[in-house]
Amino acid sequence: MDQQSFPSFMASTHFDSSINRNDTRLRIFSGTANPALAQEIACYMGLQLGKIKIKRFADGEIYVQLQESVRGCDVFLVQPTCPPANENLMELLIMIDACRRASAKNITAVIPYFGYARADRKTQGRESIAAKLVANLITEAGANRVLACDLHSGQSMGYFDIPVDHVYGQPVILDYLASKTICSDDLVVVSPDVGGVARARAFAKKLSDAPLAIVDKRRHGHNVAEVMNLIGDVKGKVAVMVDDMIDTAGTISKGAALLHQEGAREVYACSTHAVFSPPAIERLSSGLFQEVIITNTIPVLEKNYFPQLTVLSVANLLGETIWRVHDDCSVSSIFQ
């Protein structure tokens, strides 16, 4: 993808012409979790992916060997820790260790989807805070920086003792919605739970300051959600539900059913991360949604595609961020 296809919400951003986009000290390597996204990122940047050998032994152990020199290089490792989360996390840690032992100057873990991000606090007694543990593991493995996309909660950045660049996938989805022929007066942005209100409010502000509605739910267990009521008016409106991720789709599908009951004309689901644990596909393709809009931070299996699904790419966004990190330029200015 060329720079012309960069989201229009960031098109007004002045790309610093002083950025050295031909620096031979920059290396990008891909793990096995999402090689298609890594290839898109490299294509946007005009680079080739670094040569790396990753294999599994018969007993399940992971082997990583860099097949080119990274001595003194600025290395970026693209590896979301999506399902299977433990496999992909361990692979990332071994990749980081291999780069450190090969004398890379800087190692940035590019984690489009950060697994364990939901385990960011104790909700009951005697629970672990796995997000902090994973942050420690990545740091101890030898990473100098993390580049993550739409973390589940802001406090996760504070769990790392190294710099974290937080990239937002929101502009990519906003740009797509802006291309659709939906009257701004008909729009209402809906948060599927109280915890996502800040995210939905920021989204609504970008959509001509659209009104906001909130689905009030009570969760009785992991991956189980019960919708209680709706705060706000959606009658005759096009409801756009916004969340950072769709896992089993229980929350968002029950919320959509409630929106239809309350008179919504159409319901769109927008999410950066498509975890799609069963029975998500059945729920999302049941006819509740006019369209389900996601990004490719997590690869979607071919069997999980359905007619209402639209997958947008964050490759340009991540590629531009990598250039700016490498050249010590501002990252936040991309989103202003």
Curated annotation (Swiss-Prot):
Catalytic class of the enzyme: transferase
EC number: 2.7.6.1
GO biological process entries: 5-phosphoribose 1-diphosphate biosynthetic process; purine nucleotide biosynthetic process; ribonucleoside monophosphate biosynthetic process
MF GO annotations: ATP binding; kinase activity; magnesium ion binding; ribose phosphate diphosphokinase activity
Residue ranges of the region described as Binding of phosphoribosylpyrophosphate: 236-251
GO cellular component labels: cytoplasm; ribose phosphate diphosphokinase complex
Keywords from the UniProt entry: ATP-binding, Kinase, Magnesium, Metal-binding, Nucleotide biosynthesis, Nucleotide-binding, Transferase
Binding site for Mg(2+): D150, H152, D161, D165
PROSITE patterns: PRPP_SYNTHASE
A Pfam family of this chain: Pribosyl_synth
SUPFAM superfamilies: PRTase-like
Enzymatic reactions: D-ribose 5-phosphate + ATP = 5-phospho-alpha-D-ribose 1-diphosphate + AMP + H(+)
Top-level division of the source organism's lineage: Eukaryota
Family according to the record: Belongs to the ribose-phosphate pyrophosphokinase family.
PANTHER family assigned: RIBOSE-PHOSPHATE DIPHOSPHOKINASE FAMILY MEMBER, RIBOSE-PHOSPHATE PYROPHOSPHOKINASE 5, CHLOROPLASTIC
NCBIfam families to which the protein is assigned, alphabetical: PRK01259.1, PRK02812.1, ribP_PPkin
Protein's recorded name: Ribose-phosphate pyrophosphokinase 1
Gene expressing this chain: PRS1
